[in-house]
Amino acid sequence: MQLFHLCLIISCSCPTVQASKLCLGWLWGMDIDPYKEFGASVELLSFLPSDFFPSIRDLLDTASALYREALESPEHCSPHHTALRQAILCWGELMNLATWVGSNLEDPASRELVVSYVNVNMGLKIRQLLWFHISCLTFGRETVLEYLVSFGVWIRTPPAYRPPNAPILSTLPETTVVRRRGRSPRRRTPSPRRRRSQSPRRRRSQSRESQC
């Protein structure tokens, strides 16, 4: 993201949509996926519709309410905290860019194109990044990855063969606990069956002794 801004500044003195697209194409040629090191991918996140992600303001408020102390700390807390810091700083720079364009670009049509591109395209990428790392810190990385896979399977399944409602991230930990609890009774079932099968034999032997 920071490289994107640097390239944009070098490309021309007046940032345009064409310059940003050229820059992004160069970055894509490097095959950089910000989710790879966390076990996910851009493709996996793309299964979630754009309106699934909260607004950037809501995500920033959530990050501040839950993790502000850790984000402002000079200590390294986790890779997710580091990624959150970078995403928040990057969005701040994008807002500065949009403000600069609004003040310095004379052509209204070009100005609208740049601001719209930043808000829609780059805004969605930042929303995805913020949501992913906040969710990993809140629910755990494995739970989030399980959710992404579950949602991807659900959305690609024809409506006639899938549940009416999509998976919900906050319910996955509860489902996991239920599964763990469900295994234990199966292990205990053999012993009561043996006791039940042995009890009639004892009764028969006792009745025979009494008859004798």
Swiss-Prot record:
UniProt site positions, description: Cleavage: R183, S184
UniProt-listed InterPro entries: Hepatitis_B_virus_capsid_N, Hepatitis_core, Viral_capsid_core_dom_sf_HBV
Entry comment on modification after translation: Phosphorylated.
Signal peptide: 1-19
Keywords, comma-separated and alphabetical: Disulfide bond, Host nucleus, Host-virus interaction, Repeat, Secreted, Signal, Viral immunoevasion
Summary of subunit composition and partner proteins: Homodimerizes.
Biased composition regions of type Basic residues, renumbered to the chain: 178-205
Protein name per the record: External core antigen
Localization annotation: Secreted; Host nucleus
Family of the protein in this entry: Belongs to the orthohepadnavirus precore antigen family.
Region (3 X 8 AA repeats of S-P-R-R-R-R-S-Q): 184-206
Molecular-function GO terms, alphabetical: DNA binding; RNA binding; structural molecule activity
Function according to Swiss-Prot or TrEMBL: May regulate immune response to the intracellular capsid in acting as a T-cell tolerogen, by having an immunoregulatory effect which prevents destruction of infected cells by cytotoxic T-cells. This immune regulation may predispose to chronicity during perinatal infections and prevent severe liver injury during adult infections.
Main location: secreted
Protein source organism: Hepatitis B virus genotype B2 (isolate Indonesia/pIDW420/1988)
CC annotations in GO: extracellular region; host cell; host cell cytoplasm; host cell nucleus; T=4 icosahedral viral capsid
GO biological process: microtubule-dependent intracellular transport of viral material towards nucleus; symbiont entry into host cell; viral penetration into host nucleus
Lineage of producing organism: Viruses, Riboviria, Pararnavirae, Artverviricota, Revtraviricetes
SUPFAM superfamilies for this protein: Hepatitis B viral capsid (hbcag) (SSF47852)
Propeptide: 184-212
Annotated segments matching region HBEAG: 25-27
Sequence repeats: 184-190, 191-198, 199-206
Annotated spans, Disordered: 165-212
